[in-house]
Amino acid sequence: MRKTINCFIPYRESTAAEQTIHALKESSIVNKIYLLNIEPNKTLSTPEGCEILPVDSLTSSKTMKMIAEKADTPYILLYTKTSALELAYKALERMTDFLQDRECGMVYADHHEWKNGEKKKHPVNDYQPGSVRDDFDFGPLLIFNRTEFILASLQMTEERKYAALYELRLFLTLHSHLVHINEYLYTETESDNRLSGEKQFDYVNPRNREVQIEMEEAFTRYLKSINALLEPICVETDVKKGNFEYEASVIIPVRNRARTIDDAIRSALTQETRFPFNIIVVDNHSTDGTTEIIGQYKDNKAVIHLQPQRTDLGIGGCWDLAINHPRCGRFAIQLDSDDLYSDTHTLQTIVDTFYKEQCAMVIGTYRMTDFRLNTIAPGVIDHSEWTKENGHNNALRINGLGGSARILHTYPARNRRAQCQLRRRLCPGTHFLAPI
């Protein structure tokens, strides 16, 4: 059978590397295996039938261009992890079948992963035109059409240390498709066992700032290439629009947070303001005693306890329920059920900012702590990824504006006719505060 794949894998001497190399050699269509050594000063033994390539980074433009130069087969396999790879029966043949389509530039597949000693299914999503987040989950096994890979690499004119693979994928989409194979074709070992709620803050971790700057530069260049880069537009919002009994509402969606919900409510109640405000707690069918704790405030008119009749509301549905409640204030202020305000003047600061900036949304800086209020990694989240010049574009690339106190002007959020205006104003009209 014709050997149609050159493989490129990160390499360090380990049992996992041996297993991956063995799995690739078992395939009759693998031509050569290149081992990417990110520690060039370290002497490594070269497994039979392989070639070691010293690289500065697995995600640099130099590495991508080296791969393009070395590849002399129709397809390029790139494995992005150092954990052991197990291939399903004729998995590579199956993946390259899809690459025979002229419009297919890259394929990726569903897979299994070993996590904490248990083998679990790991399905991935179809790639769509708007799938531009730099952390889109393709899985670690990617196979490219060599011609398309080279064409994309030639469009990468800037030197990148961290964002080259991301940029290559973006440019790949300009002239080919990224195809998801809805079959479980391999197994890998998950090495990042953090909860998804912890992983979502990676993009704001100060230690990753240099990476994020490169990612933004690559994404901005891509937007320019497709004429999709939006210029900043300064549009003021009439924050006085609408009639409201309360100037502000602190909205706390909650489910099973018996340990923290009382502290969150008390933190809101101790706010000192020059305007009337209330607290809307949306209790999404808690079962751990949270409901009873909220019930202790039944005689406090400032605390509204909502219990949805529906059982299919996530946090977004709970937010929508609260914003459309007749007693919701002019400004809907998010407070997570395990969060506290940093001082008693936070609400006043937020509302003052709305009137000063005439903006549609305010987002606050915050600090990550443990239950004893000791600062934990990544520490202060100041959302440096947002700038007045390019934040509205960069927001498409990042994992939301995660964890922040997000505050909306209620009127446009409620009214469908005004929602198109809100969408236009939300990005250029978003203002960021110091820690709240």
Region annotations inferred by a language model:
Residues 22-31, 266-276:
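Short, acidic, metal-binding catalytic loop of nucleotide-sugar glycosyltransferases
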Residues 120-144, 149, 385-406:
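A recurrent flexible, glycine/aromatic-enriched loop bordering the glycosyltransferase active site
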Residues 159-168, 423-432:
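Acidic donor-binding loop at a coil-to-helix junction in glycosyltransferase catalytic cores
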Residues 37-44, 84, 283-292, 311:
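A conserved acidic beta->alpha catalytic loop
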Residues 56-70, 309-327:
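Glycine-rich, basic loop-to-helix element that forms the pyrophosphate-binding segment
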Residues 5-16, 27, 248-260, 264, ...:
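A conserved hydrophobic helix/loop-capping motif in glycosyltransferases and polysaccharide synthases
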